Amino acid sequence: SLYMSEFIKNTPGNGKFLYSAFQNYTNTFMKLEQFRAYVIEAATNTDIVEISISTRPDCIKDSYLDVLLDIYNTYHVDINIELGLQTANYHTLDFINRGHGLAEFIDAVLRIKKYPFTICTHVILNLPNDTMRDTIETAKILSALNIDIVKLHSLYIAKNTKLSYQYRNGTISICSKEEYFERVIAFIEHISPDIVIERLFSRVPEEDAYFSNWNTSWWKLQDELLDKMM
């Protein structure tokens, strides 16, 4: 079976699988030969036309990119690399214990740009301590780096985590829903029009979250945002 992968069907009725996503965890952290085997397993499915690999910016190595290039050329599947940046603010990255800074992200992007792959970046616009200025700066940096795709996330706080304790005792705060809308709009206004925005909100099972989307369903949030943008 494919390692942490899922399939997304094409248009209704044709039954073709198009997309294999290695989404969970840091996929380029596994051993190289194991990584090669899992990706080849996906690539040999003739219905798949794109493989998406999620990983950390500080876990991008040329040897893994070379493996993906070989698979790209051999099996004629597109390759998309998904990197979690979350914010361009180093102090916030340190506060949430990301374990990398902006420099590692830029290095990863420059490495990947040498290959015929697309790059998707994940960004959270309501991290503790981040401001509107950080939102705009993040959008500008992604534009300068010619990122292909962006997925926006609204922060959720998992139960029984350090962040949940800090939120509960008031050490940190999360911006309001209205402020989040303003940040999304500002991000869109400052991001390059050549960059595709694939997601505006994220969601998790309610039973796992101490805080999630201001107790509002993601689709209601999206409708509210679109109404605000009209």
Each language-model region and where it sits:
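Catalytic cores of alpha/beta
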Residues: 128-144
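Conserved strand-turn element in the central/C-terminal portion of the radical SAM core barrel
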Residues: 84, 90, 115-133, 154-159, ...
